[in-house]
């Protein structure tokens, strides 16, 4: 009885041994009743009861509003003490009974308004009538529920009136409870927790020894209160207090700070037993008639508590926590349990400092009662775990400890708040552990050696939280149970040792002393103000120590209120302490046998391995068992007694040995000298199902992928087909049957469009997939199988060679797939005698083969060879062009041209034999692009690589450039690139890929170009070829100026792609325009401006009319990789650019057999040439800039800039003179427009032309038969574009830099 409440316990003891015993018996009965009442599902929502009973944290961790419990406890304690003073012998029972009834009534009223009241009253009334039947009613009927303060008062009064009679019954009930308690004591955890007490289980604790008759209870209460007017007064006071709080309570979702509650002036100490009147008969002589609680007491107990806890706290019964607390019995043996219950009750009441956090956690976790406070966890849980060897005598204590874990899903609430609330009780209400608990046989003996004063509120480190005013009596209920080697939190301490009777173990909520004991250092409140900042703090620390502790933990894991650390803690509680590892009710589809096994499994684990870290400040340095580093003196260390008395860790090192995550709330399990979180410890003992996450208790299970499943859980994640013994596929840790996997995740073949089955071979590359068959995984052009061969991916398609990627029929070199660039054939070979005649042989471009680009040395070698060939070709072209050229202006290459391109300004040059420039006609420009690779038959518009604009300003190495070019130019299925093809075919867009992309309206000259393109490509090609093949030779002096080696270098130096692909403008045009196609197939035997064209049309550039500008390393990226047609004048002049590009393409086509339009960028050095380049004709004439000016060794950084209109011009030059003339006119128009144009597209961050000059010097261009047949690299074009505005401004050196 004494254990029920300090007052009650004291009363029972004072009553005399017999009286004590008698009181104990009724107390036990009443305690049982109380527990039942509190836990009764009718009183509380079933879910709440279940939660309360089964939560891991139920006992030790404060589930609900601790404040409720505190209020109840305090008010009851005060009332009981007063009553005890009046009735000593019976006071114990009365107090106990009252406490139980009051708690039940208050909680029930709060939780279930009318229904709860009826139930509680009925139960209580039955018990009082029966005498023995009077089961304890709510221990603390505080007006904790201000909303129902009147109801509570009525019920309490009724209860008081009927109280005396039911004392005997209460005793009986208590005895019954003791039996239950004994069972609980056997296990470390509370019975509800260990055995997963549901509403039914609640009955186990509550119903045992308790029979409620609502009417009886009500009548008894009424009688009791009639007799106990003092109690009525107290209730009235409480009611008054309640009324104001009622208004307050609903407002805060979270309990107000308990500090507010403290201010209540201590009441004159009433008999300690007053609260415990319910506990049993009132054998104790009424020491003092029930004294009405003083306003201060009431305020302290109710208002402060109410404010802290809020209405929730007022509704203890709603909280499962409240229910769980009712398990404590009043007997001295139960006294520790009672203390535990009180602690729980307190814990249920949110700590004033951490109420918000607690509530937030509870709210976050649906299973947890709103008022559950994670902050309270620390208190209850650690002690229970304290000693591995000692089994917690009371199940409640064990459950409290493990409850936190069991409640992992449920946020454990620290018992600390309970202690704190106890401390808040007025001193007289705060019962000394000794006073509240007469050293009854149950209380002291069961409790075992009293805990050190540090655990008692009075002894708490923080005096303001401690009940220092009260002499710290031996904390029997706080004493660690044998199971707890370390001092358990007050809640745990409240649990009696194993020796205590089971009844005492589940004593009703304890009076103040017990509460105080629980609240002492373990309460979060003990941490002081610091507690308000955190949702949980280690128990027993001062605020400064709390901060020191958290300072050693990562900020993102510090459980500040409403912080990521708080969320982390909640997640970890659920993860590390899975409820289904300990509670049957959280499991699914367990057989009865498995249920039993789970309970045993959970109980054994908790008894043998569960512990809670103890945080202390070191007095001397010691090594950390986690990191082996030294923990300095004065630092905070965490001790785990189960792993040894001296085992200590840094706070940040106190982590699970498996998941390495901080052990939440310091709860750990140990096995073989290692610490585990609850989850991983369970997995060391039993396999865990990967599907349901539950421990596999069955004899059979399925193991796959190194994991385990229940036999019926290893099934297809989609169709639930069991996969035991079946084929399956794991994806993201989930098994799928083959059918579902194919339906959900199968890839589709890019060739045939069919799904690639699990059983089928699959080839994948860069997000593309093919059946691993010769048919599907084959060259997109020639359809030769690529299985086991290197392949060239371009524009979403795969090719066996560069030629195929350009849409040309594969040549032995191209289709060989050797990946080595064949030695470029002499330009003459590549030049076809007849435009229609197929190109005899292309100089294989570095791109020709599907193999990777050559190394720089190889490139250089090829470049040298190609330069020679190109030089020859260009010479021939120049010679042929020379005849055609009416005028040849050699423009001093501007520095910026850097020897890239020197354009012959005159359109006449273009008009010359080189008018064959395909840009002169759409076909002509196309023809250049087509060049040998792009023979009309071979040409596939969809394979035309889209002009790629290199955005990099830095020098490109050829391999990289080639890869980039390939990517940009990779041929793509016609369907994919149909639009592009159309754009390319569009004379405007063809000449200027950028423009094509932009669909820029071509200037008049562009229109002319389009018209030219409209002209049959064959005509233009023929003319061009004729011109190209027979262009008037340019002045001999000019030929040398056009160093073909540079072109060859460009082709060689260029990445194979650059070399292989024509400048995209040229390439696009040539491919796009039928002419170019034809010309490609019928590349003119004469190399059209071999230099520029060679680079562009060299076999290396033999790629389909790709307009790739090559930038050399030495050249700063003055010319942006971006295609800027305006800079070339072609870009700005749209059509002009296109024409230039066509010219370039033609040049490339002529030089390269028109197949290769990969253009090395030749930077025009002469501003005039650049200006001319800007003008379509100028570009054409100047596009012949010698590529050889580029050092072969220097990697050409290719920037795809607008198709060099110069090349187009050159191509036009190759065309018939009439066409050349038209080309010249167009070019002039372009020039005019370009001159007016601003370098809009040359987004080059490149340096001025001087930079180019410094890096490269282009020999003066020669007029090729009056036709400027020269390939203008994109750089040159871009540079020209840049320079053009400057030229327009009269500043030849001015670079139009767009960055």
From Swiss-Prot:
Feature: compositional bias, Low complexity: 425-434, 844-864, 1089-1101, 1238-1249
Basic residues compositional bias, start-end: 145-159, 1151-1183
Biased composition (Polar residues): 168-181, 457-469, 922-934, 1070-1081
Domain LIM zinc-binding: 622-686, 687-747, 748-810
Deletion consequences: Flies exhibit aberrant hair and bristle orientation on the wings and aberrant ommatidial arrangement in the compound eye.
Limits of the PET domain: 515-623
This protein's UniProt keywords: Cell membrane, Developmental protein, LIM domain, Membrane, Metal-binding, Repeat, Zinc
Compositionally biased intervals (Pro residues): 263-272
Keyword Membrane annotated: yes
Location of this chain's protein in the cell: Cell membrane
GO molecular function: zinc ion binding
Cellular component terms (Gene Ontology): axon; cytoplasm; cytosol; plasma membrane
Top-level division of the source organism's lineage: Eukaryota
Pfam families reported in the protein's UniProt record: LIM (PF00412), PET (PF06297)
Biological-process GO terms, alphabetical: anterior/posterior axis specification; axonal transport; establishment of imaginal disc-derived wing hair orientation; establishment of ommatidial planar polarity; establishment of planar polarity; establishment of protein localization; establishment of tissue polarity; establishment or maintenance of cell polarity
Function: Acts in a planar cell polarity (PCP) complex; polarization along the apical/basal axis of epithelial cells. Correct expression of the alternative isoforms is required for PCP signaling in imaginal disks. PCP signaling in the wing disk requires the receptor fz and the cytoplasmic proteins dsh and pk. These act in a feedback loop leading to activation of the jnk cascade and subsequent polarized arrangement of hairs and bristles. Dgo and pk compete with one another for dsh binding, thereby modulating fz dsh activity and ensuring tight control over fz PCP signaling.
Family listed: Belongs to the prickle / espinas / testin family.
Subunit structure comment from the entry: Interacts with dsh; PET and LIM domains interact with dsh DEP domain, in wing cells. Interacts with Vang in photoreceptor cells.
Protein name: Protein prickle
Species name: Drosophila melanogaster (Fruit fly)
Lineage: Eukaryota, Metazoa, Ecdysozoa, Arthropoda, Hexapoda
Gene: pk
């Amino acid at each position: 009885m004494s254990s029920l409440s300090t007052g009650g316990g004291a009363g029972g003891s004072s009553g005399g041994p017999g009286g004590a015993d008698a009181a104990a018996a009724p107390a036990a009965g009443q305690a049982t009743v109380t527990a039942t009442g509190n836990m009764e599902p009718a009183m509380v929502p079933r879910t709440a009861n279940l939660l309360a009973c089964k939560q891991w944290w139920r006992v030790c961790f404060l589930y609900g509003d601790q404040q409720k419990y505190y209020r109840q406890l305090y008010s009851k304690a005060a009332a009981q003490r007063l009553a005890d003073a009046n009735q000593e012998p019976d006071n114990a029972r009365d107090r106990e009974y009252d406490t139980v009834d009051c708690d039940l009534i208050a909680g029930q009223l709060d939780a279930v308004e009318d229904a709860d009241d009826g139930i509680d009253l009925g139960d209580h009334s039955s018990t009082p009538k029966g005498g023995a039947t009077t089961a304890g009613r709510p221990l603390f009927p505080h007006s904790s529920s201000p909303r129902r303060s009147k109801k509570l008062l009525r019920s309490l009064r009724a209860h008081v009136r009927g109280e005396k009679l039911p004392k005997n019954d209460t005793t009986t009930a208590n005895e019954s409870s003791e039996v239950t308690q004994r069972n609980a004591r056997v296990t470390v955890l509370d019975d509800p927790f260990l055995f997963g007490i549901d509403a039914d289980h609640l009955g186990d604790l509550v119903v045992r020894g308790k029979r409620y008759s609502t009417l009886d209870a009500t009548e008894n209460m009424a009688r009791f209160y009639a007799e106990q007017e003092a109690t009525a007064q107290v209730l009235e006071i409480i009611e008054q207090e309640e009324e104001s709080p009622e208004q307050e309570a609903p407002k805060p979702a979270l309990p107000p700070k308990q500090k507010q509650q403290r201010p209540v002036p201590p009441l004159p100490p009433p008999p300690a037993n007053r609260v415990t009147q319910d506990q049993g008969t009132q054998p104790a002589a009424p020491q003092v008639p029930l004294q009405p609680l003083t306003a201060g007491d009431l305020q302290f107990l109710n208002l402060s508590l109410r404010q802290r806890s809020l209405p929730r706290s007022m509704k203890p019964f709603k909280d499962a926590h409240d229910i769980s607390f009712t398990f404590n019995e009043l007997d001295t043996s139960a006294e520790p349990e009672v203390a535990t219950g009180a602690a729980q009750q307190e814990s249920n009441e949110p700590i004033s400092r951490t109420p918000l956090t607690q509530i937030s956690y509870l709210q976050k976790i649906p299973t947890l009662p709103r008022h559950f406070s994670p902050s309270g966890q620390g208190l209850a849980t650690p002690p229970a775990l304290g000693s591995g060897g000692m089994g917690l005598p009371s199940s409640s204590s064990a459950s409290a400890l493990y409850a936190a874990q069991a409640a992992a899903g449920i946020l454990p609430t620290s018992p600390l708040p309970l202690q704190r609330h106890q401390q808040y009780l007025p001193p007289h209400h705060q019962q000394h552990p000794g006073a509240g608990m007469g050293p009854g046989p149950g209380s002291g003996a069961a409790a075992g050696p009293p805990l050190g004063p540090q655990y008692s509120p009075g002894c708490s480190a923080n005096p303001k939280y401690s009940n220092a005013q009260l002499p710290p009596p031996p904390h029997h209920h706080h004493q660690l149970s044998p199971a707890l080697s370390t001092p358990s939190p007050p809640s745990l301490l409240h649990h009696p040792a194993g020796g205590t009777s089971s009844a005492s173990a589940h004593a009703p909520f304890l009076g103040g002393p017990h509460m105080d004991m629980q609240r002492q250092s373990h309460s979060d409140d003990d941490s002081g103000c610091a507690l308000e900042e955190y949702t949980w703090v280690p128990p027993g620390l001062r605020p400064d120590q709390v901060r020191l502790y958290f300072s050693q933990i990562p900020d993102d894991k510090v459980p500040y209120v409403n912080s990521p650390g708080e969320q982390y803690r909640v997640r970890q509680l659920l993860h590390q302490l899975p409820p289904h590892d300990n509670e049957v009710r959280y499991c699914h589809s367990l057989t009865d046998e498995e249920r039993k096994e789970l309970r045993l499994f959970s109980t054994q684990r908790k008894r043998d391995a569960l512990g809670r870290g103890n945080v202390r400040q070191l007095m001397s340095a010691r090594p950390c068992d986690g990191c082996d580093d030294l923990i300095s003196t004065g630092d905070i260390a965490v001790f785990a007694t189960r792993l040894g008395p001296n085992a200590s860790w840094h706070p940040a090192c106190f982590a699970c040995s498996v998941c390495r995550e901080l052990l939440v709330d310091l709860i750990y399990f140990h096995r073989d000298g290692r610490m585990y979180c609850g989850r991983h410890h369970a997995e060391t003992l039993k396999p865990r199902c990967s599907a349901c996450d539950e421990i596999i208790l069955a004899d059979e299970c399925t193991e796959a992928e190194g994991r385990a499943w229940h036999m019926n859980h290893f099934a297809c994640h989609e169709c639930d087909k069991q996969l035991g013994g079946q084929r399956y596929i794991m994806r993201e840790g989930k098994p799928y049957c083959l059918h579902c996997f194919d339906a959900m995740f199968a890839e589709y073949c890019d060739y045939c469009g069919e799904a690639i089955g699990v059983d089928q071979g699959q080839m994948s590359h860069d997000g593309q997939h093919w059946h691993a068959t010769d048919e599907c995984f084959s060259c997109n052009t020639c359809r030769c199988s690529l299985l086991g061969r290197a392949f060239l991916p371009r524009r979403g398609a795969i090719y066996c060679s560069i030629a195929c990627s350009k849409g040309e029929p594969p040549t032995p070199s191209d289709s060989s797939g050797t990946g080595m660039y064949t030695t470029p054939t002499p330009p003459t070979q590549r030049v076809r005698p007849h435009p229609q005649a197929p190109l005899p042989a292309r100089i294989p471009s570095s791109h020709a083969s599907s193999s990777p680009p050559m190394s720089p040395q190889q490139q250089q070698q090829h470049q040298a060879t190609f330069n020679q060939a190109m030089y020859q070709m260009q010479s021939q072209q120049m010679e042929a062009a020379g005849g055609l050229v009416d005028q040849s202006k050699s423009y001093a290459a501007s520095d910026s041209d850097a020897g890239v391109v020197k354009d012959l300004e005159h359109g006449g040059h273009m008009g010359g034999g080189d008018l064959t420039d395909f840009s002169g006609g759409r076909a002509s420009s196309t023809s250049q692009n087509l060049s040998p690779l792009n023979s009309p038959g071979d040409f596939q518009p969809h394979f035309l690589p889209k002009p790629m604009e290199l955005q990099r300003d830095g020098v490109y190495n050829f391999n990289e450039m080639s890869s980039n070019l390939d990517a940009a130019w990779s041929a793509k299925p016609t369907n994919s690139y149909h639009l592009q093809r159309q754009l390319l075919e569009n004379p405007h867009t063809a000449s200027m890929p950028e423009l094509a992309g932009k669909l820029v309206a071509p200037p008049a000259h562009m229109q002319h170009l389009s018209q030219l393109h409209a002209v049959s490509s064959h005509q233009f090609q023929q003319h061009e070829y004729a011109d190209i093949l027979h262009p008037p030779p340019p002045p001999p002096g000019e030929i040398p100026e056009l160093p073909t080696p540079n072109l060859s270098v460009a082709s060689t130096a260029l990445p194979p792609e650059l070399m292989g692909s024509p400048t995209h403008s040229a390439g696009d045009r040539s491919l796009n325009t039928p002419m170019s196609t034809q010309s490609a197939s019928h590349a003119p035997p004469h190399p059209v401006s071999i230099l520029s064209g060679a680079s562009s049309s060299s076999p290396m550039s033999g790629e389909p009319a790709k307009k790739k500008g090559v930038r050399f390393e030495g050249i700063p990226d003055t010319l942006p990789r971006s295609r800027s047609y305006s800079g070339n004048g072609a870009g700005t002049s749209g059509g002009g650019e296109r024409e230039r590009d066509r010219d370039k393409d033609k040049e490339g086509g002529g030089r390269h057999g028109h197949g290769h339009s990969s253009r090395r960028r030749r930077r025009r050095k002469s501003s005039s040439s650049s200006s001319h380049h800007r003008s379509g004709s100028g570009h054409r004439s100047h596009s012949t800039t010698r590529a050889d000016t580029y050092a072969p060794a220097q990697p050409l950084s290719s920037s795809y800039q607008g198709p060099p209109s110069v090349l187009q011009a050159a191509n036009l030059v190759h065309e018939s003179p009439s066409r050349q003339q038209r080309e010249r006119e167009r070019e002039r128009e372009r020039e005019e427009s370009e001159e007016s144009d601003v370098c809009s597209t040359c987004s080059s961050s490149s340096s001025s032309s001087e930079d180019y000059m410094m890096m490269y010097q282009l020999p003066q261009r020669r007029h090729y038969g009056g036709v400027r047949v020269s390939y203008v690299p994109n750089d040159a074009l871009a540079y020209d574009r840049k320079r053009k505005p400057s030229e327009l401004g009269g500043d030849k050196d001015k670079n139009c830099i767009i960055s």
